[in-house]
């Protein structure tokens, strides 16, 4: 019985030692090596691997030379892996930590772009037959974020793309509100129908 306890203790010590060695190895990896590894993986489109290297920079060198760029790159790699919620959170974090960064417009732009795709039902719902049940919450959030981006950075390199997305989103949201208004009108819910129509007139006056 004593041997079993001894084996358990030794196993625990061994596992603890492995964990400590892993942490030490990670901390001992130079920041520049981690950054170069991340860039190499981005170039080869290994975005998951790139995210791992960037996380290691953020964890081991939070105030390092490459920390700021690593956090910016995390916005991109999360976006490319389809992890839009994480990309949005990374953009918000970057804006909060580096409001004076020369590329801050990119973070604001990506906030809008991630919202554009984050709602998995955004495009499938656009085709649904039950028009009044479309959920355009994600579209509205994306519309608001991209509008904020255009107001803040009208000279940004990303303006043209943001505007094209806004046209699509505006038409999508207006179509949803109009279909919902008709749906409520047919069922005699006149107040609800009026509210939907008023929303379009007030917020989307130039919708085609």
Language-model-derived ranges and their functions:
Residues 7-14:
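Bacterial N-terminal signal peptides
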């Amino acid at each position: 019985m004593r041997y079993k306890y001894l084996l358990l203790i030794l196993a625990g010590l061994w596992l603890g030692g492995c964990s400590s060695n892993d942490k030490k190895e990670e901390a001992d990896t130079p920041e520049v090596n981690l950054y170069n590894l991340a860039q190499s993986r981005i170039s080869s489109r290994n975005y998951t691997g790139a995210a791992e290297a960037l996380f290691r920079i953020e964890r081991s060198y939070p105030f390092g030379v490459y920390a700021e760029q690593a956090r910016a790159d995390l916005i991109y790699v999360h976006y490319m892996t389809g992890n839009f919620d994480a990309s949005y959170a990374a953009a918000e974090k970057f804006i909060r930590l580096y409001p004076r960064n020369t590329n801050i417009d990119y973070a604001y732009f990506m906030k809008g772009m991630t919202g554009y795709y984050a709602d998995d039902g955004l495009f499938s719902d656009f085709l649904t037959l039950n028009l009044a049940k479309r959920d355009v919450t994600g579209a509205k959030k994306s519309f608001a974020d991209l509008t904020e981006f255009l107001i803040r950075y009208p000279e940004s390199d990303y303006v043209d793309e943001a505007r094209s997305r806004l046209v699509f989103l505006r038409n999508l949201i207006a179509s949803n509100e109009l279909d919902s208004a008709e749906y409520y009108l047919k069922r005699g819910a006149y107040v609800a129908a009026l509210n939907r129509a008023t929303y379009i007139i007030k917020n989307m006056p130039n919708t085609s």
